Amino acid sequence: MSSAKNSNSHGDFFTPLIEGFVEMFQVLITKAVESFPKLLKNIGTPQITINQSSMKLVLSMLDCERQTVDQAHLGWAINTNRPYPLEYFDPSKNTFIVGSSGWGKSNLLSVLQENCIQRKQGLIFIDPKGSLEAIRNFKKLCRYYGRNYYIFSEFDKEAGSFNPIADMTNSQRVSMIMRSFDWGKRPNQYYLNEAQKALDDVLSSLTAKGEEFDLHDVYKKLKTEHNKEETSGLISQFQLLLNSDFGKLFKKANEFGKPSATMKKAWEEKACIYIGCSTQGYSTLAKTVGKLFVSEAMNLSYWIGKTYEDSHKIKENSLGLFIDEAGSVIYPDFLDLVNKCRSSGINVYTAVQSYSDIEMVADSEILMKQFFESYSNWFIQKQTNTENAEKLASACGTFLAQKTTLATESGSESGKGTIREGYEYLCHPDIIKSINVGQTILLEHNPKWLSLINVRDVRGSNAFKDVKEVDKSAPIAPIKKGLGRK
């Protein structure tokens, strides 16, 4: 009987504990069931917090000479001590490249252009240098990957005819021509208006015939029907352009009857276009040529956006628009293209030699600040000007750091001092001024990250290796050099 009492007393003792554990377990199960959908929702979208100080670049990193030759890599990321795969790079966020002449900008552009073609994109390269080497490298790239191409050059044997005014409305043609010509800093508004009216009248008359026409047709009709003082500036600029070495290229068909090239046609074919307009050899005239093609690119972006609703179709036909020495050929309205081109699948790569080149476009620092907001990928190379280096260092950002000061007595440390917080550069201006040939600082946004990279030497790429002399001017379509590459 006593044993039964003991058993009951033990049961009475443990019963509240057991009930408490059961109740707590039920609460945990309930909470888990309530939280489970939230856990599922967050799977795959982890929230990563990056410590700003971990991105800091230091001067000693510039001594690293480690390289990578893998064509899948942009180069060797010194601060993370590993290759930087090109698949990490997002060209759809638009890319701004700034670097002094002779410090590896052309090599970087070639790496990015090859990546563009590897992504099965079209390619348009507006090059105010217009050099033989640039054209040869462009052809090598296209031949290796079996891509059709069109060349605009005053001296290249494969250069064809172009008709940049073909695929647009008359209003767009008027805007394109007027902003491409040089009217001076303070043009007479009356003369501008009269020139536009005459141009619109000529274009309307030519359009009514229902046949393709080119800049030569516009010039002839202007000279015949609107040759007066108010339009003399417009007619003179047409004459200088079309009588120049570039004039023979602005025709609706070449001497063999082959149709002229347009950016719309290249976009539909996924073909590549090289535009050579040497500002060194032709100054203002070459700038006019460059602006004509930049305007055509803007109109292509507009046409794609209004024609296609299917974002997948646009993505399939995306293209890279590369503009080297951009300060020579762009104008303030160019930012409209940069800000809106993502919806049309155009990835813009804008390269200049210095921060000041963009300021000169509109004679204002405001434009440069707008550029800061419009490009999410920044490649920064050598800058010799202290002010430019400081502005670019500021763009890279700062982080909050502790700074320690020590007190001294009679020239020796006293053991006393202060600790205070202050902001330090993630990339000090001295790094930008001291960067070596072939190195670049890559600033990316969303998420923000800073990399110091030894850019891969494109001469090691199979696409850019020298070919036999007989192949240098061979037709492209039948060549299949890319089949054996690794």
Task: Name each region found by the language model.
Residues 166-171, 338-340, 344, 351-441:
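Conserved ATP-driven motor cores of ASCE-family P-loop NTPases powering translocation/secretion/packaging/pilus
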Residues 17, 28-82, 86-346, 430-452, ...:
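P-loop NTPase motor domains
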Residues 13, 17, 21-24, 28, ...:
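Short acidic-hydrophobic sequence patches enriched in Asp/Glu that either
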Residues 1-43, 399-421, 483-485:
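Glycine- and small hydrophobic-rich membrane-insertion segments that are intrinsically disordered
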